[in-house]
């Protein structure tokens, strides 16, 4: 996606092969590192499943059919069809589903809350994924070099700290290696699995779903608990849809069916084959399937793969936060672009350091990947259930599919999703509470901000003066006009900006050209430059300039002025242009709205958000900020 008109990930259109390799490096890092801990966790003593060949076959069968139903059918075949101008992810899906509901209706509010809650659950995932991935990789030292086992946590913390510290410089240089490294990783997974599969080919019987059904029937409650661990193989599946805008659906589908899925299935079947012949290997089936001489190199390769998986999640957190800001669910924050070639490469200091602190706390609190596995999954299952609901709305109301077909497809996926969700709920006390707490806290903050902004707009409209009649009266009896251009940033072009009223009150002048600039976020990810600007001439050198942006773009005032010059013929000399911004101080009150403590929280968030001049990239020496107090 170029910064101007397209939604492609790279400025120059890369080849299909490059897109496939790039997708392997970014999209499949999380799901690709699950073999490090998933099968081991399925046989955790806490589940009470006695080890037996039938149990191995049953669990491997469940893993196989989880890949087929959830990833291959649900995400690859159905959900990835629901693109919003090429973009995927739960916020893009929410925007699509919202088009099917009447504005401000109860259904629209419900869709919005579901979508935002699903997105918020990603923040819990963004903390746990780096912790469990890197920790499980470094734990390979306990097998490869037992003498270094007491250094597992310090090494993990060092790697994670370095990963977060390099975010400010961007990862676009080393990022070119992500794809090739992950290709090597998946080939290694497949090769290791194939070696053991050849030695015990009987494990192939697990393809028969009868083994999964028999396991569930024979072990009832224990098998249901194991479902929560089986789900670990699917963590990261949602990335196939979320990263669709970066690489396109076809390269992601190709990577999944040609390399990723075959190699993952080979590895899990290989681990199962090894366990049939050596039950003691359940201590760490992944590393024990590696020949002794290659265990240390495999630890290094696994660590590289988990760092790549963690990087994808961190970048996802930055991207999600940026989208939430544009959609009006978060206060403005500093966003830095770390690559001139890829608009998706952004860095958000506040989010970066919060994640680092939380990841370190999680590693120190849980200490082992086994313990973290209990906390993993609940956030992803929640998002998957919500995705199924939203996709059903899109299938029925946007694509106009037959209601019976939509019901059949949705119920099939919902039964699977809810089974995994219910199984993960059993792990709340063991650590599942953490991602729920993270996601719930984020949801509360986002909804508080959204509600506070609505109150703020309502108060402004109540006290506002209609803009066009005011300008007509002002031009009929004009104050002293001074040279230059005044740009007034406003969120509502129906009312007179407070900054203009204060300027007239205190300075008693009006610039020879006045521009009211409004940024509007649309429900699509990107807006073409040809459709971005609209201008209304109010006469007397006064204009309303509206600039539309997608929810994955960041407004830039200088770029808008350049575009206005090219598209509309409006000349702007930056050093002769002053930008007037109203800096609102929010005062909590007993007026109808939110509770006082939530209003106080909103006021604090509003006060600590990034300055509009920083967020909109306005030169600091051209900004005039005028303060005003608003009671909500």
From Swiss-Prot:
* Cited Pfam families: K_trans, K_trans_C
Catalytic activity line of the entry: K(+)(in) + H(+)(in) = K(+)(out) + H(+)(out)
Query: What keywords were assigned to this record?
Result: Cell inner membrane, Cell membrane, Ion transport, Membrane, Potassium, Potassium transport, Symport, Transmembrane, Transmembrane helix, Transport
Please give one Gene Ontology molecular function term for this protein.
potassium ion transmembrane transporter activity
Taking the first listed entry, what is the main subcellular location of this protein, grouped into a coarse class?
A: membrane
Q: Which residues cross the membrane?
A: 19-39, 59-79, 110-130, 146-166, 178-198, 221-241, 256-276, 298-318, 346-366, 375-395, 403-423, 428-448
Give the record's GO CC terms.
plasma membrane
Q: Which InterPro entries match?
A: K+_transporter, K_trans_C, K_trans_N, Kup
Q: In which compartments does the protein localize?
A: Cell inner membrane
Query: How does the protein's chain sit in the membrane according to the entry?
Result: Multi-pass membrane protein
Function text: Transport of potassium into the cell. Likely operates as a K(+):H(+) symporter.
Alphabetized PANTHER family for the sequence: LOW AFFINITY POTASSIUM TRANSPORT SYSTEM PROTEIN KUP, OSMOTIC STRESS POTASSIUM TRANSPORTER
Q: Which family does it belong to?
A: Belongs to the HAK/KUP transporter (TC 2.A.72) family.
Protein name listed in UniProt: Probable potassium transport system protein Kup
Gene name? kup
């Amino acid at each position: 996606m170029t910064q101007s008109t397209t939604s492609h990930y790279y400025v120059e259109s890369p080849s299909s092969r490059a897109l496939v390799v790039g997708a392997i490096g970014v999209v499949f890092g999380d799901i690709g590192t699950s073999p490090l801990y998933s099968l081991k966790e399925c046989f955790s003593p806490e589940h009470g499943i006695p080890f037996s060949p039938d149990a191995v076959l049953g669990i491997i069968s469940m893993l196989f059919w989880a890949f087929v139903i959830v990833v291959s059918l649900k995400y690859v075949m159905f959900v990835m069809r629901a693109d919003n101008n090429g973009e995927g992810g739960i916020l893009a899906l929410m925007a699509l589903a919202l088009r099917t509901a009447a504005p401000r209706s109860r259904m629209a509010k419900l869709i919005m809350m579901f979508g935002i809650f699903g997105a918020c659950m990603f923040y819990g995932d963004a903390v746990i994924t780096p912790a469990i991935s890197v920790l499980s990789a470094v734990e390979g030292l306990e097998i490869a070099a037992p003498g270094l086992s007491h250094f597992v946590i310090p090494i993990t913390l060092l790697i994670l700290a370095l990963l977060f510290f390099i975010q400010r410089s961007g990862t676009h240089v080393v990022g070119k290696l992500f794809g090739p490294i992950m290709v090597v990783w998946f080939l290694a997974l497949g090769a290791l699995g194939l070696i053991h599969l050849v030695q015990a080919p009987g494990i192939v019987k697990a393809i028969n779903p009868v083994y999964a059904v028999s396991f569930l029937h024979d072990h009832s409650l224990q098998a249901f608990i194991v479902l929560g661990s089986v789900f670990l193989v699917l963590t990261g599946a949602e990335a196939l849809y979320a990263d669709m805008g970066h690489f396109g659906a076809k390269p992601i589908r190709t990577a999944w069916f040609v390399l990723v899925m075959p190699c993952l299935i080979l590895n899990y079947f290989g681990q199962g084959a090894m366990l049939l012949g050596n039950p003691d290997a359940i201590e760490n089936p992944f590393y024990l399937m590696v020949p002794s001489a290659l265990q240390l190199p495999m630890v290094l390769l696994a660590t590289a793969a988990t760092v790549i998986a963690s990087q994808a999640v961190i970048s996802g957190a930055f991207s999600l936060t940026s989208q939430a800001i544009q959609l009006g669910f978060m206060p403005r924050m500093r966003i830095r672009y770390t690559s001139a070639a890829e608009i998706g490469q952004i860095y958000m200091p506040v989010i970066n350091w919060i994640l680092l602190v939380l990841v370190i706390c999680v590693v120190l609190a849980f200490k082992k990947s086994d313990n973290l596995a209990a906390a993993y999954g609940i956030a992803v299952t929640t998002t998957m259930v919500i995705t199924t609901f939203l996709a059903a709305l899109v299938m029925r109301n946007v694509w106009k599919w037959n209601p019976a077909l939509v019901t059949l497809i949705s119920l099939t996926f919902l039964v699977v999703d809810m089974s995994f969700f219910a199984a993960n709920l059993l792990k709340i006390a063991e650590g599942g509470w953490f991602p729920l707490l993270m996601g719930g806290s984020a949801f509360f903050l986002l909804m508080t901000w959204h509600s506070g902004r609505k109150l703020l707009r309502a108060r402004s409209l109540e006290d506002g003066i209609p803009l066009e009649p005011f300008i007509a009266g002002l031009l009929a009896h004009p104050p002293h006009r001074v040279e230059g251009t005044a740009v007034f940033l406003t969120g509502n072009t129906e009312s007179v900006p407070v900054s203009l009223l204060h300027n007239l009150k205190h300075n008693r002048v009006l610039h020879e050209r006045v521009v009211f600039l409004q940024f509007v976020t649309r429900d699509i990810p990107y807006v073409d430059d040809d459709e971005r600007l609209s201008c209304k001439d109010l006469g007397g050198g006064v204009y309303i300039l509206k600039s539309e942006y997608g929810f994955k773009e960041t407004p830039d005032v200088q770029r808008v002025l350049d575009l206005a010059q090219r598209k509309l013929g409006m000349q702007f000399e930056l050093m002769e242009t002053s930008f007037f911004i109203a800096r609102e101080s929010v005062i909590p009150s007993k007026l109808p709205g939110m509770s006082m403590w939530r209003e106080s929280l909103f006021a604090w968030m509003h006060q600590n958000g990034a300055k509009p001049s920083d967020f909109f990239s306005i030169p600091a020496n051209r900004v005039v900020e005028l303060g005003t107090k608003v009671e909500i």
